[in-house]
Design a protein with these regions (language model features):
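Acidic/histidine-rich catalytic neighborhood of metal-dependent amide-processing enzymes
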Residues: 140-243, 268, 272
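Active-site-adjacent substrate-binding region
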Residues: 217, 224-333
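N-terminal capping segment at the start of a domain
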Residues: 31-71, 82, 295-312
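Bacterial Sec signal peptide processing site at the extreme N-terminus
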Residues: 21-33
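A non-catalytic alpha/beta surface segment that caps or lines the substrate-entry region
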Residues: 60-113
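Second-shell loop/turn segments in exported
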Residues: 35-42, 57-66, 93-96, 139-150, ...
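Solvent-exposed loop/turn segments at secondary-structure junctions
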Residues: 62-63, 92-95, 113-114, 124-128, ...
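C-terminal motif of bacterial Sec signal peptides marking the signal peptidase cleavage site
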Residues: 17-18
Length: 333
């Protein structure tokens, strides 16, 4: 992902006129329905942490490497073991420098027959460049990508495990996007091209795993396991999936995770959610770490460095994100 230059977009206030109903019984029924809240399963942060560790144990999951191939097999088998119908999308994608990437999007579908669907996604690849590392000698080394990549996948694997045991009312699709982090490096002197990022999600949005695929909305998890992480409204999400953003952050407040989910806008980013929406036409919310006080990067001091390792993971952060997402999807009708 990449921070985008600030864009200010005015919002148009829309007036909504509600039709009255003289029936007291109808009004009472509606009021009762609004109060019903489904108790979601308990998200296990230890389990999510273990799935993150398992990915890290393969090493950097950079496309065209053995670690990448081995981890892809692991992820597909995990989803299958959790009862999902698994789809594999293999594609040759062209990187910014002309490298052909042997990419693989991995999709796990629950209740594939249901027309009511929610999309949950994260990227599973590691960045091939530690181009934000304070040591220039590391700039062309592969990063481990524990928070940036593995954390979102780990949370979704734990959600998949829970969905196998207790399915929500709607169909769930979990997608692990590939080749998200192969964008133009900081040391490149040529013209910047936004679409060199998020290659896997661009491919999926153009050629979804199911013809005519559509979901009510999506939730993207990116860098969701760091110590002291905070998640602000991501501006693109807040413009294009505003009601979903409000719903997720409100749920986090209700669950006691307001110190993680900050009800303010952060920085706009280029991430998979942009292409899920612009190409796939599905509104998608990016839950992504944002630290306005961090000097090296608002994504955190170890973003795109050799220090994106397990030492930075916090089970409390994983719990806050995972439980919030689960409570949201289990209360969909």
């Amino acid at each position: 992902m990449k921070i985008k230059d600030l864009i200010i977009v005015p919002f148009l206030a829309l007036g909504i006129v509600a039709c009255g109903n003289s029936s007291k019984q109808s009004n009472n029924t509606q009021a009762t329905e609004k109060k019903v809240t489904v108790k979601a399963p308990v998200f296990n942060a230890d389990s999510a942490y273990a799935y993150i560790q398992a990915q890290a144990d393969f090493g950097p999951r950079v496309p065209n490497t053995q670690a990448h191939r081995d981890c892809g097999e692991y992820l597909a088998k995990q989803l299958e073991s959790f009862g999902a119908k698994v789809y594999n999308q293999y594609a040759d994608l062209t990187a910014w420098d002309g490298t052909i990437l042997k990419a693989r999007n991995i999709i796990g579908a629950y209740k594939p027959e249901s027309k009511k669907r929610i999309l949950l996604c994260a990227h599973w690849d590691s960045r091939p460049y530690a181009d934000n590392d304070p040591n220039p000698k590391n700039h062309q080394k592969h990063i481990l990508g524990v928070n940036d990549g593995a954390s979102g996948v780990g949370v979704l694997l734990e959600i998949a495990r829970q969905v196998k045991q207790q399915e929500p009312n709607v169909g769930i699709d979990i997608i692990f996007f590939d080749a998200e982090d192969y964008g133009i490096p900081e040391f490149y002197q040529g013209a910047y091209k936004q679409d060199t990022w998020c290659l896997g999600s661009q491919y999926w949005a153009r050629t979804p795993h199911v013809q005519g695929y559509f979901a009510r909305y999506g939730i993207l998890l990116d860098m969701v396991g760091g110590k002291g992480a905070t998640f602000f409204y991501e501006p693109y999400s807040n413009r294009t999936a505003r009601s979903e953003v409000k719903k997720i952050w409100k749920k986090a407040q209700e669950l006691g995770y307001g110190n993680y989910f900050v009800q303010q806008e952060g920085a706009e980013v280029i991430d998979d959610h942009v292409y899920v929406h612009t190409i796939g036409r599905i509104p998608c919310v990016d839950i992504i770490n944002y630290d306005p006080t961090c000097e090296p990067s608002s994504f955190g001091s170890y973003w795109h460095t050799m220090n994106d390792t397990m030492e930075n993971m916090d089970r409390n952060t994983l719990k806050a994100v995972g439980q919030t997402v689960m409570d949201v999807i289990y209360n969909e009708k």
